[in-house]
Amino acid sequence: MQSNLSQQKENTTTVKEKTVQIQVEQSSYDVVIIGAGAAGLSAALGLVKSEEYKALKSQGKQPKILVICKLQALRSHTGSAEGGIAASLGNIEKDCWQWHYYDTVHGGDWLSDQDAAKMLAKEARDTVIELEHFGVAFSRTEDGHINQRFFGGHTADFGQQPIRRAAYAADRIGHQILYSLWQKCIEENIKIEEDIYVTDLAINHKSNSVEGIIALNEKSGKVEKICARNVLIATGGAGRLF
């Protein structure tokens, strides 16, 4: 018994804790947008044309906007969309935003944010026209209008019959939208950083507010703290952050 105890004592090794210091690079922006798909790029462009942004510019100030993505920007999953973008243009048959609104809420099993669904349906027409101005090459009717086709869940008269509502660009609508938004962001000198993997939000627990993000720069291998007055999460559905 004693020999076993002494043997165990001899085999015991003391492990000392070692503190590893990680160098964290820090930068600061007015707005950081996480995600460079259609939502993130659209948000950046929306900020640029906002009255607040223009007012700051008129005062000689340059608001700093940063869009970050974990891959190359044009590899966003937005580019995989094929069917079309819903908008009550009425180019093929009579349509209205109220029908589009109903279909959106109904398609979401009545769980959707109905205020957001109403805004989406009402503004879809102007959004499609704006995308056309950005350079999206929509498929056309013989008389030159944006073409539309049937797509699942699009109905007339509040669910009574199918309707052609999806504006499309052959089978590459997502690709067209993504590239056009990206090009517009480049024209507006919006900064886009690639290969940045967000690991956490920087939270001030005293004020219970978000002050930026913590991220891993996969190119340099360094951890970065990016401070921001505003953080917008536009990461799509895959991460399930919704």
Give residue spans per PLM region.
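Conserved N-terminal/central alpha/beta ligand/cofactor-binding core
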Residues: 3-12, 18-23, 63-64, 69-219, ...
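Ala/Thr-enriched low-complexity intrinsically disordered regions
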Residues: 12-13, 55
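Generic structural signal for beta-strand residues in well-ordered domains
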Residues: 24-26, 58, 191, 225
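Core beta-strand elements of the Rossmann-like FAD/NAD(P) dinucleotide-binding domain
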Residues: 26-29, 220-230
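N-terminal Rossmann-like FAD-binding beta1-loop-alpha1 element of flavoenzymes
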Residues: 31-67
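Mobile, glycine-rich extracellular loop/lid and propeptide segments
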Residues: 33, 214, 231
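Catalytic-site beta-strand/loop segments enriched in glycine and acidic/polar residues
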Residues: 37, 225-242
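Hydrophobic/aromatic ligand-binding patch that stacks against planar heteroaromatic rings
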Residues: 46, 77, 231
